[in-house]
Design a protein with these regions (language model features):
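Serine-dependent acyl-ester chemistry module
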Residues: 82-238, 254-260
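Membrane/wall-proximal cationic-aromatic binding patches
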Residues: 1-40, 44, 57, 168-181, ...
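Active-site-proximal beta-strand/loop segments in catalytic clefts of secreted hydrolases
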Residues: 17-18, 48-50, 78-80, 213-215, ...
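Loop/turn elements at helix/coil->beta-strand transitions in domains of secreted/extracellular proteins
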Residues: 42-44, 71-75, 203-209, 244-246
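Catalytic His-Asp segment of secreted/periplasmic serine-dependent ester chemistry enzymes
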Residues: 217-222, 227-289
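Conserved SGNH/GDSL esterase-like catalytic core that processes O-acyl groups on lipids
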Residues: 23-108
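Generic structural signal for small/hydrophobic residues in well-ordered secondary structure
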Residues: 19, 59, 75, 202, ...
């Protein structure tokens, strides 16, 4: 956004939280989902979306420590199965390529309970960690902006794990599926633990809307007859929405494969101007009229 976020914001502001889809990668500010929805409904939408490998752990931290302090009475939470189950699971990021990926990850400490940790938390030279993380992050962002390698980083990590046979690394993404058809239970449990934590922290709001966002690959799989609604992640997120009194809104129920192809950039799958606009219009029609 290009406006200050402070205590003078309207009390009926809406928090938007998520990754690069929420931030609006690929379009100008005025064409992002948040800006379009704001103009459509006449209410301030505070955009707390963030690109660069941002998952449920960071989103929970961001809301708890910053966004929750601002005036608002509703939340829109973007959830992307294609990314959100692996962003904060260290097993997916342990190759040498990701040695200095300084991000918060989850780890299980007891049944149904997780904590946040940083991979370099025992190293005393925090400046060196930050410097290496910054350099690595810049390389990643250049790869994402100017090549088709956003997901290639994960692919390299999986291949590294496969050939080195590291036991604490996910050996292949194929057996775990992808996106709407992802079925790594450990990754699902850890990720959704923090999604639920985020929603519970927003329990005082008038409404919490969870928007599940598919990818083109998900539509291809659905077109070929695959069904995801009996998989663990979907059943779990349905249960969480009920437990937190949130509304679950699955975009895959409202678009066809051919529709989606017109809504995204061919280079990376983020919404184009039309995609941001049509999704904002759909959200308005269903929840703000």
């Amino acid at each position: 956004d290009n406006e200050p976020y402070d205590e003078n914001l309207p009390k009926n502001s809406i928090i938007l939280i998520g990754d690069s889809m929420a931030e609006g990668i690929g379009v100008n500010l005025e064409n992002t989902f948040a800006e379009v929805l704001e103009k459509e409904i006449g209410r301030k939408v505070l955009n707390f979306g963030s690109a660069a490998f941002f998952g449920p752990v960071q989103e929970e931290i961001l809301y708890r420590t910053l966004a929750s302090e601002l005036p608002h009475n509703e939340m829109i939470y973007f959830f992307l199965p294609a990314n959100d189950f692996t962003e904060n699971d260290r097993r997916w990021w342990t190759s040498r390529l990701n040695k200095f990926r300084h991000r918060p990850y989850f780890r299980k400490i007891k049944n149904n309970e997780y904590e946040v940790f940083y991979p370099n938390e025992k190293i005393k030279n925090k400046f060196l960690i930050s410097l290496k993380s910054f350099i690595f992050h810049r390389i990643q962002m250049l790869a994402i902006q100017y090549t088709y390698t956003a997901n290639t980083l994960k692919t390299i990590n999986r291949l590294y794990a496969k050939f080195t046979k590291k036991k604490d690394v996910v050996n292949t993404g194929i057996s775990s599926g992808y996106g709407y058809f992802f079925d790594d239970h450990e990754a699902i449990d850890g990720s959704l633990y923090f999604s639920k934590k985020l929603l519970l922290e927003a329990s005082n709001l008038e409404r919490r809307l969870i928007v599940i966002i598919p990818s083109q690959i998900d539509f291809d799989n659905m077109y070929n007859g695959k069904n995801y609604k009996n998989l663990k992640w979907y059943l779990d997120i349905k249960r969480i929405s009920s437990q937190t009194n949130s509304i679950l809104f699955d975009l895959a129920d409202h678009f066809e494969k051919e529709d989606w192809e017109k809504m995204v950039h061919t280079c990376d799958g983020h919404w184009d101007i039309y995609g941001n606009s049509i999704v904002a219009e759909l959200i308005k029609k269903n929840f703000f009229e």
